[in-house]
Design a protein with these regions (language model features):
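Active-site beta-strand-loop-beta-strand hairpin of nuclease catalytic cores
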Residues: 241-250
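Long, low-complexity, Lys/Arg-enriched
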Residues: 1-28, 42-236, 246-247, 256-318
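Anionic group-transfer/hydrolysis microenvironments
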Residues: 34, 239-241, 254
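Gly/Ser/Thr-rich loops at beta-strand to alpha-helix junctions
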Residues: 32-43
């Protein structure tokens, strides 16, 4: 049932329309008021009153279900913890109307390619303070003729026809970039950090500290598109996602300067939409120096975990 998630009147009318259409008015109804927006909660509450039907609410953090037969009768039931190791199970629970454009599963062939670039990703991370200020220059270089030729500050970076050459302070890397050419630009101006973090987390995956590690997922929910009033689906992009068997974790990787607070709002909102109230969102920043004081306050207010060093250790302990 498609609704405008921020218009309680629209939601309420859609519920009545749905029940009438399917002949549910005289059936025994019970409303689940868990999740969604506050407007959805209020509309569901009003609908339950209209039908004089009970409703329930699941407190995820307390692991209990609150059942309301009427406003004066509340029963509480403990919910046994069931391990959820599959990322998409969280999506099924919280957004059954999801659409997955890119599932983020790294197959053996893709993993080999990431491993081939691992030394380059490590080198870029090691010298990130010198690389990041060159992002715009690299982008402009590539835009001209799909080549990159940078030589400054004891650093050489060259790219043409899938051939990559990087030399920083005498440390040299030659490799053939086997992906789509346009993907290399995305990689060199920030995608390397996503791959760097992914490789860091592989050890936690092997130790079964985390499960179902995904990279670069793209998802959409019908209500997200309906809210924007568009026909084309609006996709949420998750840089990295995984489970610890209890909660969904969503990681946003940022190597360059972060100016747009909307990125943080989207991270927080998408994490709760796809993983529920207990889902955890992490911002991985290559350095806290790229974050202004206002941005850092926003991160704190949105309950986002900021990690800028010892990534594997800090993520494991979060």
């Amino acid at each position: 049932m498609e609704v405008n998630v921020f218009e309680p009147k629209n939601i309420y009318e859609k519920i009545l329309e749905h029940t009438n259409k399917h002949g549910l008015k005289d059936k025994r109804l019970c409303f689940n008021l868990t999740g969604g927006t506050k407007m959805m909660f209020l509309a569901g509450l009003k609908a339950s009153e209209y039908f004089q039907a009970p409703y329930f609410y699941i407190e995820e953090k307390a692991q209990r279900l609150l059942f309301f037969k009427n406003p004066s009768s509340i029963e509480s039931f403990a919910i046994p913890a069931i391990p959820i190791k599959d990322v998409e199970t969280f999506f099924s629970l919280h957004v059954p109307n999801r659409m997955i454009k890119q599932n983020g599963i790294i197959d053996e062939k893709s993993l080999e390619k990431i491993q081939e670039r691992k030394n380059l990703s490590n080198l870029l991370y090691e010298h990130r303070a010198r690389i990041i200020p060159l992002y715009q220059k690299i982008n402009n270089n590539y835009a001209k003729d799909k080549t990159i030729n940078i030589c400054e500050n004891n650093m050489r970076m060259f790219y043409r026809d899938h051939q990559v050459f990087v030399n920083i302070d005498g440390k040299e890397i030659n490799l053939k970039y086997s992906e789509n050419e346009d993907d290399f630009r995305d990689y060199i101006i920030g995608g390397w950090l996503e791959e760097y973090i992914y490789c860091e987390l592989l050890e936690l995956l092997d130790k079964q500290v985390i499960y179902d590690l995904r990279l670069n997922m793209r998802l959409s929910v019908e209500s997200m598109t309906a809210t924007q009033g568009g026909k084309r689906p609006i996709y949420a992009e998750l840089d990295i996602a995984f489970s610890d068997s209890k909660n969904l974790y969503v990681v946003e990787c940022k190597s360059g300067e972060l100016k747009n607070k909307g990125v943080l709002t989207a991270l927080s909102t998408n994490t709760q939409i796809f993983g529920g109230a207990n889902a955890k969102c992490i911002l991985v920043a290559s350095d806290t120096d790229i974050l202004s004081q206002n941005i850092q306050e926003r991160i704190k207010n949105l309950n986002i975990k900021l990690i800028s060093r010892d990534f594997k250790k800090n993520i494991e302990n979060y």
